[in-house]
Swiss-Prot record:
HAMAP family: tRNA_methyltr_TrmB (MF_01057). Keywords: Methyltransferase, S-adenosyl-L-methionine, Transferase, tRNA processing. One of its GO terms (molecular function) is tRNA (guanine(46)-N7)-methyltransferase activity. S-adenosyl-L-methionine binds at E45, E70, D97, D119. Residues 1-25 are annotated as: Disordered. It catalyses: guanosine(46) in tRNA + S-adenosyl-L-methionine = N(7)-methylguanosine(46) in tRNA + S-adenosyl-L-homocysteine. This is tRNA (guanine-N(7)-)-methyltransferase. Substrate binds at K123, D155, T195, E196, Y197, E198. It comes from Lactobacillus delbrueckii subsp. bulgaricus (strain ATCC BAA-365 / Lb-18). One of its GO terms (cellular component) is tRNA methyltransferase complex.
Length: 218
């Protein structure tokens, strides 16, 4: 969902190049170890919205590095404000298109990718834009380590069914799958980190679909 333009958020991104990259040149490799100041494992959320999910993870896991990849500059600015307000040194913001994922991260550089409530692009002519289309799966496979995982959540049953089929056809394995995440075991529910969108729709009784999937050995 596109957010209303907020000039302050756009300006904030421009004022903090040490914390946020605004559409960097894909031809120039990003030195993530230098940006984080360490070489801890990196986890990426592709499409971070207002950042509730990724900032919560960053607070919970100071031993990991996180990148919020968000194409909307206003959304990137909102996430950046949360990062700065909460002093999250293990979070970087990348305002860029996921189509350039491999250029920005390089091969075997990432331990986990989160896809939360991505645009379903329901029309068949837009299939290639879905973040679980085979071409995107190939990009994820390239940047993930051998045991890396994709964690995917959606409220859209059609996108979930499509994603299961797409990943299965790609030869991926599934470590977890649920068609009603918020009614799983207490342990699973407690470990789940909600997005803003997820909280809104789950509170109305909308089932949340979820899967964790990985690739066969490279």
């Amino acid at each position: 969902m596109r957010l209303k333009n907020k000039p302050w958020a756009n300006e904030l991104v421009e004022e903090h190049p040490e914390s946020a990259l605004d559409r960097p040149n894909p031809a120039e490799k990003i030195d993530w170890a230098a940006r984080f100041g360490n070489d801890k494992p990196i986890e990426i959320e592709v499409g971070s919205g207002k950042g509730q999910f990724i900032t919560t993870l960053a607070k919970q896991h100071p031993d990991r590095n996180f990148v919020a990849m968000e194409i909307q500059k206003t959304a990137a600015g909102i996430i950046l404000k949360k990062k700065l307000d909460e002093g999250l040194d293990n979070l970087q913001i990348l305002c860029a298109d996921a189509a350039n994922l491999v250029a920005y991260f390089g091969e075997n550089s990432t331990s986990k990718i989160y896809l939360n409530f991505s645009d379903p692009w329901p029309k068949s002519r837009h299939e290639k834009r879905r973040l679980t289309y085979k071409d995107f799966l190939a990009k994820y496979q390239a940047v993930l380590t051998g045991d890396g995982l994709i964690e995917f959540k959606t409220d859209n049953s059609g996108l979930f069914a499509y994603s299961v089929k797409s990943m299965n056809n790609y030869g991926m394995h599934f470590d977890f799958m649920s068609v009603d995440l918020h009614h799983e075991s207490e342990e699973i529910v407690e470990k789940n980190v909600e997005t803003e969108y997820e909280h809104k729709f789950a509170s109305k009784g909308q089932p949340i679909y979820c899967l964790h999937a990985g690739f066969l050995a490279k």
